[in-house]
C-alpha cells in the first residue's frame, strides 16, 4: 500500500493509505475501520479488492492507529465524518467517472451509515459489517445512564469494557494478533465516545428509511460484541430496492478475520462485481 499524511481541518495529522489495481480501476472503495483498531488490519481486504480490479482507499481515524489524537477518542461523531469527506475529496477528482463504494466495519460501519446518509448522492453503494445500530443492546441501562451523567464531568474517562479480544473471531490467532499489535487500543471505551456512538446509532435508526442506494449488510451470528439485531433493522427499514442481508453462522464480530473469511470476502467481491458490471 502507498501511505501518506492528511492534514485535518484542525491541523491534526491523519494517516492515510491506498492501493491501486493494475490498469484502470473498476470502481473506488473507501474502507472504514472500527473502534480501537487501524486500517492496517484490513490489508488483506484491500489486497483482495485491488486484485479484483478495485482501487482501495483508507485512513486511520483521529485518535486511532498512526493518526494523531488521544487514543480511541474524539469529541463527537461529526469528526470522522468531516475527516472522511476531506479524504474522499482529496482523491475523488482523479477518478471523476468511477463509482464510489463505502465498506465499513463495526464503529466504522456506523460511521459509514452516517456518512452515506450525509452524502448519499455521491455514493454508489454501501457495505457494512457488524454495525452497532442498536449500540446499547449489549449494555445495561444503568451503565448507559452512568455514561451520560459522567459525560458532563469526565468525558475522557475510560469506562466501558467491550470484552477481551477472544470475542473478535473464532480464530484465536486473531485475538492474539490484536493484543500484540502496538497500534490497537486495549483499554476501556472513553465516556464521550460511548455516548457519541449511542447518540449516532439513535439518529441513524431514525433515518434508515432515507437510505435508497444498494446495500450489502453483513453480520456474524455469533457476534457477542455487537448485537446482530442492528443489522437486521437496517435491512428492514432501509428504503433501498436493492438490499442484501447476510448473517453468517459460526462467525463472531470480525467476519473478515474469521476462519471462513474467504466466504465473507467472496460475498463482498461478488456484490461489487454485480454492481459494477
Placement of each model-derived feature along the sequence:
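N-terminal cap/lid segment of alpha/beta-hydrolase-fold proteins
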Residues: 1-23
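Short beta-strand element of the alpha/beta-hydrolase
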Residues: 26-34
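Catalytic nucleophile-loop/oxyanion-hole region of alpha/beta-hydrolase
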Residues: 36-38, 65-95, 99, 264
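Conserved alpha/beta-hydrolase
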Residues: 46-69
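Alpha/beta-hydrolase-fold enzymes
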Residues: 105-189
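Short beta-strand/loop motif that positions the catalytic acidic residue
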Residues: 211, 217-219, 223
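Short alpha-helix in the alpha/beta-hydrolase fold that links the catalytic acid
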Residues: 213, 227-236
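Catalytic active-site module of serine/aspartate enzymes centered on a nucleophile-bearing elbow/loop
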Residues: 244-277
Amino acid at each position: 500500500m502507498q501511505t501518506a499524511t492528511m492534514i485535518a481541518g484542525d491541523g491534526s495529522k491523519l494517516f492515510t493509505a491506498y492501493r491501486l489495481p493494475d490498469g484502470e480501476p473498476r470502481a473506488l472503495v473507501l474502507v472504514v475501520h472500527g473502534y480501537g483498531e487501524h486500517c492496517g488490519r484490513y490489508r488483506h481486504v484491500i489486497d483482495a479488492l485491488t486484485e479484483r480490479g478495485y482501487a482501495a482507499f483508507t485512513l486511520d481515524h483521529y485518535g486511532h492507529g498512526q493518526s494523531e489524537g488521544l487514543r480511541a477518542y474524539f469529541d463527537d461523531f461529526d469528526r470522522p465524518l468531516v475527516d472522511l469527506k476531506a479524504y474522499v475529496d482529496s482523491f475523488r477528482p482523479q477518478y471523476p467517472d468511477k463509482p464510489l463504494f463505502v465498506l465499513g466495519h463495526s464503529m466504522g460501519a456506523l460511521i459509514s451509515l452516517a456518512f452515506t446518509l450525509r452524502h448519499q448522492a455521491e455514493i454508489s453503494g454501501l457495505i457494512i459489517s457488524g454495525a452497532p445500530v442498536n449500540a446499547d443492546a449489549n449494555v445495561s441501562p444503568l451503565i448507559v445512564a452512568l455514561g451520560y451523567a459522567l459525560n458532563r464531568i469526565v468525558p475522557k474517562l475510560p469506562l466501558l469494557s467491550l470484552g477481551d479480544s477472544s470475542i473478535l473471531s473464532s480464530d484465536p490467532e486473531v485475538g492474539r494478533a490484536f493484543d500484540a499489535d502496538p497500534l490497537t487500543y486495549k483499554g476501556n471505551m472513553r465516556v464521550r465516545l460511548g455516548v457519541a456512538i449511542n447518540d449516532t446509532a439513535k439518529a441513524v435508526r431514525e433515518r434508515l428509511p432515507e437510505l435508497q442506494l444498494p446495500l450489502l449488510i453483513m453480520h456474524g451470528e455469533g457476534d457477542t460484541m455487537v448485537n446482530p439485531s442492528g443489522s437486521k433493522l437496517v435491512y428492514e427499514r432501509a428504503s433501498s430496492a436493492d438490499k442484501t442481508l447476510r448473517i453468517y453462522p459460526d462467525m463472531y464480530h470480525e467476519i473478515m478475520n474469521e476462519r471462513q473469511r474467504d466466504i465473507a470476502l467472496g460475498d463482498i467481491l461478488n456484490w461489487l462485481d454485480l454492481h459494477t458490471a
